[in-house]
Amino acid sequence: MVENPIVKKYMHESSEKISSASKAQKLNIQAEIIYPDIHQTFWARVIGLGYPTPEPPGFRWCTERLKINPMNKFVEECIKTNGEIIILLGVRKAESAARSRSISEKEIAGYLLNPHNNINNAYVYNPLTEIENSLVWEYLLKDNGISPWGTSMKQLFSLYQGEDLSEEQSVLGEIDEKKIPITGNSRFGCWCCTLVKEDKSLQSFINK
């Protein structure tokens, strides 16, 4: 696969802890990790079939094959079992002007749920659209940065910051005293991405 290995490790550990905590507390919650069909993976297309790698501005076949299609397939399977589904997304308008436009275009005044663009009986709920980045991190880092299922939100914040917060920096202290604004604006992409000239998040991991 092509995910950043450090981020992948964190997400797999989090997924296992969510499922374990849910089982222990007898909650009907299960974390699922979705994969693309083996024939649609990046290396199968590029090395196996000779596909040219994605390049800007518009040649971006990877997102649909590696992310969108597998998720849509999973959603459709859930609908077959349950009749309908609500998809929660963590998108925010403050991420970028393009993201803000995209969210606004899909919003329906007076409704919390928006119909999915392509899938019947699927609805999208975006609970964080108006919330600032610093408030998201403030919430995640409360309770000493430990999530209800036992993962470290400080570690997650460290990944987004590109620095180790375990030694000299007290993130929770900064939040409580309002001394330093929380940023954590990094974005993680595929380590082999050919759409960007420089992968800053990957470089920060190398520097560490």
Locate predicted features.
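Nucleotide-activated chemistry modules centered on ATP-dependent adenylation/adenylyltransferase
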Residues: 1-208
